[in-house]
Amino acid sequence: MSSKATKTVKSKFDIINNQLRDDLIDFRSGDTIRVDVKIKEGYKFRIQSFEGLVIKTQGSGITYSVVVRKMSNGVFVERTFPLHSPIIDSVTLIKRGKVRRSRIYYIRKLSGKAARIKEIMPTKQAKEIK
């Protein structure tokens, strides 16, 4: 491999590493998160929140994305977010859920109380409740 080729590969890695976000929180399927997205309207930007259940996480590095499901006006909406995208302003963890699958597509078929997910409380909160 020539030195020119290795330089271009290194420069590509540098560009990708500069675009990676380091402020992402740790979450997984079953958790409820709020994603704040920048939306351009004319010449201005505004922030729109999308809060829902994480159905799937996928990819690694710059391609890491997440599918979030929420109910809006009686209709369920699923949206895919590439988390290292510049349009993502912030991601906030609302609550942790206990599921045994990494991709919880079965939640689409459930309705009402059957669609609930058991909440996991941090140890401090669990001790305070008891």
Swiss-Prot record:
Biological process according to GO: translation
Highest taxon of source: Bacteria
Stored InterPro entries: Ribosomal_bL19, Ribosomal_bL19_CS, Ribosomal_bL19_sf, Translation_prot_SH3-like_sf
Molecular function terms from GO: structural constituent of ribosome
Gene Ontology CC: one annotated term: cytosolic large ribosomal subunit
Gene3D superfamilies xrefs: 2.30.30.790
The keyword Ribonucleoprotein belongs to this UniProt entry's keyword annotation: yes
Keyword Ribonucleoprotein: yes
Pfam family, one: Ribosomal_L19
Residue ranges of the TM segments: none
Keywords for this protein: Ribonucleoprotein, Ribosomal protein
Protein family: Belongs to the bacterial ribosomal protein bL19 family.
Function: This protein is located at the 30S-50S ribosomal subunit interface and may play a role in the structure and function of the aminoacyl-tRNA binding site.
NCBIfam families reported in the protein's UniProt record: rplS_bact
Protein name: Large ribosomal subunit protein bL19
Gene that encodes it: rplS
